[in-house]
Amino acid sequence: MLPNHILTAIATIKHSLRTETPRPICTLSLSRNLSVSKFVPCLSKENKRDVLETIAKQFSAIEGEEFFVLPLKDLPIWQRECLLEHYLFPYHLGSYLEGEALIVNQAGTLLAGINLRDHLVIHGVDFVWQPEVLLQKLIDLDIRLQQSLSFAFSSDFGFLTADPLRCGTALIARAFVHVPALKYGDALSELLVPYQREFASSSLLPLSQESLGDILCLSNICSLGLSEEQILSSLRLVVSKILSAEREARNQLVKENPTEIKNRILRSVGMLTHSCCLDLQEALDATSWIQLGMSMQWIEDSEKHPLWNPLFWDLRRGHLALYNQDTANRSIEKEVIAQIRAKATKPQAERLIIRI
C-alpha cells in the first residue's frame, strides 16, 4: 500500500496547474518485454512472479530516485483507482492480479505497469501539453533500465510487443482534448475522417465507448516503422486542427447565441448545486457545459478559479475516496460515491456567477 501522504502529494500535483483555458492533456507509454521470457499471455503464475521480481529489483536499484513497488493483489481498490485516474492509465485491470504490479516514483511523474499486456509499460502524464519533455523522461528511465535488463529487440521490427502493431518504438501517445462545441454540432466525426488510419478515438475510460464530459481521446494506432518524433509531430498536428475547429465552433455558438446552449449551461449549474447524488457521466457532462459557459464569459467563478482542472480528475471515485473519506473507512461503492460526488461539487457550483 502506498503511504497516504505520498499518494496525496501525487494526486494534488494537478491543483498547482490551474489555467483559465483547459489545455490538452497527454500521456505516453513505452512497452517493453524481457528477452528471456515469453509474452504475458503465455506466462504461468510462477513466471509472472519471476518477471515481477526481476523488474522490481532493477527499479529499486536506481540511484537518486525512490520508487514504490505496489503488487496489485495487495493494493486497496480505491488506491488503485486513484493512481489509474491520476495518470490516465489506459489499461483495464482484471480480477486476476497475481504477478502484476504498479510502480510509481515519489515525484509522481512516472508510473510503470508490470505484467499487464507486456512485461513492462513505462507511462507518464503531461498536464501542460509538452509531450516532448515527458518523452525524454521516459527514454531516460528506459536507458537506465537497459543497463541491467535485456529487452526483446529485433533489427527488423524494433522492440517486440504482444501486439505486432505496437512494435518498433513501442510508443503509444494519447491526447485528451475538451471539445464540447464540436460534440454539440456533430462536427467531430467528419473532422476526424482524414486521420482515422493514423489515430483511434476513444472514451476517457478503458473499455467504454461512452463519451464522458465531451472529452476526445486520440491515440496512435501503430508505432511500427515510426520514430517517437514522428508520432508526436503527427499527434500535435491533429490536436492543433481539432483545437482550431473547436474555437471556430465556439465562436459560432456565441454569434448565434442559441437559447438551447444557455439552457443546458444553466441546467448544469442547477444540477451541481442541488443534486444529492451524481454519477460520473452526469457530473462530467455538467462540468463540461459549465466550462464551455466560462469560456464564453457567460459564467465566472467568484474566486477566479477555473473549474475543469482539477475537477476533471476529482469527480472520479478514487480521488473522491482519497479526499472525502476517513483513512480507515474508504469505499468506492456506487451509491456512496454518488453522494460524495454531489456533496463535493456543490460548493464549487454555488460560487459561480451567472452572466447570461
Curated annotation (Swiss-Prot):
Record CDD domains: bacterial_phosphagen_kinase (cd07930)
UniProt superkingdom: Bacteria
Protein name according to UniProt: Protein-arginine kinase
Record EC number: 2.7.14.1
Reaction(s) catalysed (UniProt annotation): L-arginyl-[protein] + ATP = N(omega)-phospho-L-arginyl-[protein] + ADP + H(+)
One protein family per Pfam: ATP-gua_Ptrans
Claim: Iron is one of the keywords in the record: no
Gene (name only): mcsB
InterPro entries per record: Arg_Kinase (IPR023660), ATP-guanido_PTrfase_cat (IPR022414), Gln_synth/guanido_kin_cat_dom (IPR014746)
Domain Phosphagen kinase C-terminal: 22-249
Gene Ontology MF term list: ATP binding; phosphotransferase activity, nitrogenous group as acceptor; protein kinase activity
Alphabetical keyword list: ATP-binding, Kinase, Nucleotide-binding, Transferase
Keyword Repressor: no
Binding annotation for ATP: 25-29, 172-176, 202-207
Role, per record: Catalyzes the specific phosphorylation of arginine residues in proteins.
Family the UniProt entry places it in: Belongs to the ATP:guanido phosphotransferase family.
